[in-house]
């Protein structure tokens, strides 16, 4: 969507005739000239029946060849969606209008609205009809969100042919819409993984940042202490250099690090990435985010997955085609994402942040490239240390332990939500000592997550 133009006084612009309509008028003029020439030729050579039949046949075929292209000219498709986001199991109404702008009728039109799997349509999504000049036909259907994701509604493919069905033309309209089906959330019980208290009540055990307003006491000077921390009055009283101590900064929220690399989920379908274990990981992230935000804390998101929006080209313009295969190819989304960028949502609070996070998680797809441990190490210098780094992954190996150890040495509080596939045998863990691990095999485990403290 383009930004609204700046407000201002604009001179009235004369109405311009669309290029397609002007092209149609030129074709009409050419057709009348051709018909006149044929009639003149027929008048001069009317002595032979076979010549007459040949001229008539040629005229019929010529007109038939022009009709399919002429029918597609001057057609306008308008689309509207009742909403752009919907919960799983929710519905949204899709409306479509097909308008004939030209002076001639549009004959023998077959239109079909392309709707991606994940949105189950109920209602009219195709039709066969002819449109009079300036006539508009309207249709609507109800779309049911059946699974998490970003789904395209449209484009419409319009097919027309000559009266004999010998020549067919296809048009793919550029008008499309998108519906985001949000992930499920589960109510988490009281408590929090780092203890029986909410995050904001848990002081940090190690911290590179301290709260200077929370004076704790003094201690003897050690090599490397900053001179700005020296407590001069205590030094004068004791005769030894004394350094001020402050309480470590309290934790302000959680950073959800979600593993979405294709190598970590070998059982997930390559094209759609829909898999019960993958969906459970996304549900866990959305549920934890909601729990923390409701308690007034901040949530950030980091993932090595891809954005489903990258599957759809931004320069979509539609077009007209002679072959059905070309039209169908044009309506398909890319099977792969051309370039992957790690998903990163800045820390935030409140309802707006929850909506932002759920939308980002809805569009999250599996992607090749960096693993989650590699991403955590690469992003460690810029991650906020006031947030708990909570990794959500299906495997505790693959370098995750080393990455969490690096983060702990840098002053981060860390934890792991282990998404284990039903029936899978527990894998050997290689995590640093003291890192809390929370096993999640289904949504029931998520409901009990808040009461766990390891």
Language model feature labels by segment:
Residues 2-13, 174, 192, 220-454:
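Exposed, interaction-prone extracellular/peripheral surfaces
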Residues 22-35, 92, 168, 204-225, ...:
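Short, charge-rich amphipathic segments
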Residues 12-17, 38-40, 69-73, 115-118, ...:
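Short amphipathic alpha-helical segments, especially helix-boundary/capping motifs
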Residues 1-79:
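Extracellular/lumenal glycan-associated context and N-glycosylation machinery
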Residues 20-24, 36-44, 86, 121-125, ...:
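Short N-terminal helix-initiation segments at or just after the protein's N-terminus
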Residues 26, 47-48, 116-117, 184, ...:
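Short, structured coil/loop segments at alpha-helix boundaries
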Residues 49-51, 59-320, 388-392, 406:
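An amphipathic, basic-hydrophobic helix/alpha-beta surface used to engage anionic
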């Amino acid at each position: 969507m383009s930004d609204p133009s700046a407000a201002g006084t604009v001179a009235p612009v004369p109405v311009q005739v669309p290029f397609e309509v002007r092209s149609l008028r030129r074709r009409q003029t050419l057709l009348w000239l051709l018909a006149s020439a044929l009639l003149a030729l027929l008048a001069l050579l009317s002595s032979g029946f076979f010549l007459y039949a040949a001229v008539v046949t040629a005229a019929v075929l010529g007109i038939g060849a022009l009709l399919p292209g002429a029918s597609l000219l001057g057609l306008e498709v308008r689309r509207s969606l009742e909403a752009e986001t919907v919960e799983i199991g929710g519905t949204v109404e899709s409306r479509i209008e097909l308008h004939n702008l030209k002076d001639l009728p549009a004959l023998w039109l077959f239109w079909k609205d392309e709707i991606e799997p994940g949105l189950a349509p109920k209602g009219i999504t195709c039709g066969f009809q002819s449109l009079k000049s300036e006539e508009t036909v309207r249709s609507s259907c109800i779309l049911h969100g059946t699974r998490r994701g970003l789904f395209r509604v449209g484009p419409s493919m319009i097919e027309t042919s000559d009266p004999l069905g010998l020549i067919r033309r296809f048009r793919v309209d550029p008008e499309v819409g998108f519906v985001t089906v949000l992930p499920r959330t589960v109510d988490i019980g009281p408590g929090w993984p780092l203890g029986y208290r909410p995050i904001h009540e848990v002081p940090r055990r190690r911290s590179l940042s301290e709260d200077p307003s929370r004076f704790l006491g003094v201690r003897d000077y050690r090599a490397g202490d900053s001179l700005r921390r020296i407590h001069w009055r205590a030094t004068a009283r004791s005769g030894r250099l004394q350094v001020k101590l402050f309480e470590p900064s309290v934790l302000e929220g959680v950073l959800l690090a979600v593993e979405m690399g294709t190598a970590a989920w070998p059982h997930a379908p390559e094209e759609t990435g829909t898999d019960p274990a993958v969906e459970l990981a996304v549900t866990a992230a959305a549920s934890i985010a909601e729990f923390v935000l409701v308690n007034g804390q901040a949530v950030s998101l980091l993932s090595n997955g891809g954005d489903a929006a990258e599957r759809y080209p931004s320069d979509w313009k539609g077009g007209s085609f002679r072959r059905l295969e070309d039209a169908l190819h044009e309506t398909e989304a890319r099977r792969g994402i051309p370039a992957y960028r790690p998903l990163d949502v800045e820390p935030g609070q409140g309802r707006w942040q929850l909506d932002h996070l759920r939308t980002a998680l809805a569009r999250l797809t599996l992607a090749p490239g960096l693993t989650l441990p590699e991403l955590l190490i690469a992003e460690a210098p810029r991650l906020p240390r006031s947030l708990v780094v909570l990794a959500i992954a299906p495997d505790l190996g693959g370098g995750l332990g080393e990455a969490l150890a690096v983060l702990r040495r840098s002053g981060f509080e860390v934890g792991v939500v282990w998404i284990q596939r039903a029936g899978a045998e527990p894998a050997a863990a290689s995590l640093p000592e003291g890192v809390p691990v929370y096993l999640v095999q289904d949504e029931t485990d998520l409901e009990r997550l808040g009461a766990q403290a390891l």
